[in-house]
Amino acid sequence: MPIVHIDLIAGRSQEQLKNLVKDVTDAVSKNTGAPAEHIHVILSEMQKNRYSVGGVLKSDEEAE
């Protein structure tokens, strides 16, 4: 039972998220042989003020 965790910044549409989990499921199934119904994809969305790169919050990057 493959489990895929994806952390991403919030803001994508429901359609984009549906397409993402479908594509990830298909790729994992193709490359592992696991049936799609046994593949779990967990999406964790975070706000831009809860994520940083190089010590700079993503929310602060946009303010610059």
From Swiss-Prot:
Keywords: Isomerase. Gene3D superfamilies: Macrophage Migration Inhibitory Factor. It comes from the Bacteria. Its EC number is 5.3.2.-. It is an enzyme of class 5 (isomerase). One of its GO terms (molecular function) is isomerase activity. The lineage of its organism: Bacteria, Bacillati, Bacillota, Bacilli, Lactobacillales. This is Probable tautomerase lp_1712. It comes from Lactiplantibacillus plantarum (strain ATCC BAA-793 / NCIMB 8826 / WCFS1) (Lactobacillus plantarum). Belongs to the 4-oxalocrotonate tautomerase family. The active site is at 2 (proton acceptor).
